[in-house]
């Protein structure tokens, strides 16, 4: 096991409150620490993860409250379509280079399972942040599932669904216009110029319908739909909670 800076990670034998000071004389501490228990995972978000092998325990350490652990947490709430229920997840969204978090091996996408040996799977974003921020030494139990990528794909899925809905509405409008023009063409027996004009219009509509039926994946009118799935630590739509620690 690699050895690291004493102020980056130490063993999980103890955790400190805001009134404690890390031991500056500690040497050759281990990066990974033995978890004292396995914490239950959320079935919806943790499918495919081997619970026992995936969980890893780290102990982060800083000298003062003015210094940073070097990572940022972000919380989302995902909606389970099968049961129409909401499930929260808090994960590491950013890790500063050469920070205590970086030297400990914390990775963007790590999910926070427990803080100081207390499960936080159902805790709010504010509760998790408070439990970490009040410590000079904090033990974390993490599971990696690249949540950042999952969120990006979820955003893209939302965007594509809105684009598809917009194209379907456009298609229906064009089909209705085509039907009206076709009816007008069938009923009227005007001069050849009018007939040619109608035929030209119908041809243009056919071309538009082909384009609608094969839409390219691009942003609809420059609209950004990401906010639709960025929700806070409760269950309502709003601004995502991001906190640097």
Curated annotation (Swiss-Prot):
PTM note: Phosphorylation at a C-terminal Ser/Thr cluster is required for limiting autosome, but not X chromosome, movement in early prophase I.
Cell compartments where the protein resides: Cell membrane; Nucleus; Cytoplasm, Perinuclear region
Region (Disordered): 1-25
SMART domains cross-referenced by the UniProt entry: PDZ
Keywords: Cell membrane, Cytoplasm, Meiosis, Membrane, Nucleus, Phosphoprotein
A single BP term in Gene Ontology: meiotic cell cycle
Phosphoserine sites (modified residues): 233
Primary residence: membrane
Tissue-by-tissue expression: Hermaphrodite and male germlines.
Phenotype reported upon loss of the gene: Normal brood size, with a slight increase in embryonic and larval lethality. Higher number of male progeny. Increase in germ cell apoptosis.
Region (C-terminal Ser/Thr cluster): 233-236
SUPFAM superfamilies: PDZ domain-like
Compositionally skewed regions (Low complexity) per UniProt: 8-17
Family matches, as InterPro entries: Intracell_Traff_Signaling_Reg, PDZ, PDZ_6, PDZ_sf
Topology of the protein relative to the lipid bilayer: Peripheral membrane protein
Keyword Secreted: no
Keyword field contains Oxidoreductase: no
Signal peptide: none
Note: Shares partial functional conservation with human CYTIP in meiotic DNA double-strand break (DSB) repair.
Known partners and oligomeric status: Interacts with syp-3.
Protein name per UniProt: General receptor for phosphoinositides 1-associated scaffold protein 1 homolog
Organism of derivation: Caenorhabditis elegans
